[in-house]
Amino acid sequence: MKMKTKIFRVKGKFLMGDKLQPFTKELNAIREEEIYERLYSEFGSKHRVPRSKVKIEEIEEISPEEVQDPVVKALVQR
């Protein structure tokens, strides 16, 4: 049985220095729960931001037509 990946748009903020930086990311995953782990991991490795400083405000499933990120769009069109 093959699991179908879904595309999610995530909005939130993270603390960079003493300022809250807004972010919007588009990620593909099988379940919404995977998004949390991938996002925390990415911010930790790229920005050295601890999980407690990342606030995810909204996660919504989007259709392939709504994708704006060129990398995610290329993955979807395969």
Curated annotation (Swiss-Prot):
SUPFAM superfamilies: RplX-like. Keywords: Ribonucleoprotein, Ribosomal protein, RNA-binding, rRNA-binding. This is Large ribosomal subunit protein eL20. NCBIfam families: PRK00773.1-1. Belongs to the eukaryotic ribosomal protein eL20 family. The gene is rpl18a. The keyword rRNA-binding applies. The lineage of its organism: Archaea, Methanobacteriati, Methanobacteriota, Methanomada group, Methanobacteria. GO terms for biological process: translation.
